[in-house]
Amino acid sequence: MNAVFCSGIEDGPLLTFGTAPEPQLAENMVLVRVELVSIEAIDLIKLALYRHGLAEPPPGGIVGCQASGTVEGIGAQVTRFRLGDRVVAYHACGSHAELFVAPEASTWHLPEGLDPGSAAAAPFTLAATRDTLCNRGRLRAGETILINHVTSSLGLMTVQLALETGAKVIGIARDPACRDRLRKIGLTEILSATRDDVMARCLELTQGRGVDFVFDVSAGERTADLARLVVPGGRYAAFSVIDSIADQPYGPDGAAPDATGPELERLPIMTASPMHDPAVHAQVGVMMGRIAKGELQLPIEHEFALCEAAEAYDFILHGRPFGHVVMRP
């Protein structure tokens, strides 16, 4: 089968396209003939970890965690799926290929009306945003949340979920041309990362108070400034929480991290429980149903061929996509 591999770690991760043996099907696994692969934020993070020697590439080298397609094989212990079922599946690695195996517990049937692109992009984004924002982050009506890199896949879903809580939402966009598209999902307070004085504008929009919650999808951009905008006792969610903000002063007065008073709560953008947890699985299923009904939007910015994986990753990092990027084998 055709697949995308990660190699060349000593000189930085290199994505290459080639052939690989078909994956082995364990008793609790589902074999999926892939229709569309989604490139998730967690995939980008893993490449960064490989680059810095903080993690090893997966056995066999095939990267990617999520894809939609059709069930082509089932393990002996699988009970919820049949051959031919349309599904989306999540696993630690192996999705960037024509065939993908994933545990039954982290595989979902596609709700009627859900297109394969939105399906491929759904599980991780839905689980990570919901858990970070609503479960661990406890965002409430009347609070103010600032979303950095708001046009990312995670940023766009965070906008929608935050608005549903009744919170005030401010977004920082790298591409000012996206304003009209952001307004269509309900965001009205939009700051330009390149044209606006973000600190001054946020303080203006909050009458000098600052924000209760920062949801930072960037790779550490503006961390020091954004932490200063969080009120004491507020929350800061990011991918590299410990490294990027543990030592940052926070609050309008620039309190030291060990200062007396309410601490800044630091949250990783992730699910507290694994994707195969029954509660996570159920929540993702409900939210996918909402996407199928048009109640939530999960935009797909561009589709690449699987053999163009290197270009697809580069597009995400430098092309300012609005939402997800997917690949077709």
Where are these regions (language model features)?
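A glycine-/small-residue-rich N-terminal strand-loop-strand element
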Residues: 47, 68-91
